[in-house]
Amino acid sequence: MAKRHAEENEDTVMSESLKVVDTDFINVDFEFFDPQPIDFHAFKNLLKQLLGYDHTNVNLSALADLILSQPLLGSTVKVDGNNSDPYAMLSVINLNTRRDEPVIKQLTSYIISRLAKSNSRLENELQKLLEPNSGSQVGLIVNERLINMPVQVIPPMYNMLLEEMQWAINENEPYNFTHYLLLSRTYTEIESKLMDDERPSKKGKKSKKTSGEEVMFFHPEDEQFREVAIDIADYPFANQDFNPDANRVFQDAGIKPQGELLLMTNEDFKNLVPKLMEIYSA
């Protein structure tokens, strides 16, 4: 799968594209591009979506700029050519070598604070990996797309990322990661309070939780990442003032969004990417 570069002329250069076919919708050709300055505002919006209610805890402009400072690493997906807004983005940030940059200090502090509330074991492990003398290199995977984007566009992005990181390593750039930390989002389905109020009470019978707090995925591929993860944290957003009826997706249920952090070894991540290509083949 080839990727278009900023300097390529759209009128004369054709890239490989991914055609997603769905019998219920029109066919769409998705093109892959390097991150470039024109993507700044779209990146900010995608990062805001990724961080959910906690997006105010991180300087999104600085984070978008940092990602754009690595133009040969990572991908965007567009449908209307190079000058259009990306529908998806993927990049990776070295949390060790960039530890002194203000936005990474801010982001790392936020991540640690959320782990302290949800998984102290993973909190301690990550802090050890990020110590200056740990000998480890942790790559933070930043992946987000518009809600209705087909998952089939994602595996090629990861496959290209592996290739780009290897090229960077060959040039002695700091992308030889020992671990990857995936930042993502999940949700649980919860019963509507409105339905509780409307439903007549029944003596001697307690209401049962609608989903048993089953974790659901905004990103389907996260299910495969969880299978190979060293550790997992599903954490509540710090700024969440939650009303289940503001996020109702079914007649009798709402959704409760939450953050997700997955820690993986380099080997497990690299081995999983080809499997994602098979599972979600277009």
Swiss-Prot record:
The source's superkingdom equals Eukaryota
Q: Which gene encodes it?
A: bcp1
What family, per the record? Belongs to the BCP1 family.
Q: What is this protein called?
A: Protein bcp1
Q: Which InterPro entries match?
A: BCP1_family
Q: Does the keyword Endoplasmic reticulum apply?
A: yes
Gene Ontology biological process terms in this record: protein export from nucleus; ribosomal large subunit export from nucleus
Q: What function does the entry list?
A: Involved in nuclear export, actin cytoskeleton organization and vesicular transport.
Give the species.
Answer: Schizosaccharomyces pombe (strain 972 / ATCC 24843)
Where does this chain mainly localize? endoplasmic reticulum
Q: Where in the cell is it found?
A: Endoplasmic reticulum; Nucleus envelope
Q: Does the keyword Nucleus apply?
A: yes
Q: Which UniProt keywords apply?
A: Endoplasmic reticulum, Nucleus, Protein transport, Transport
Would you name any one GO CC term?
Answer: nuclear envelope
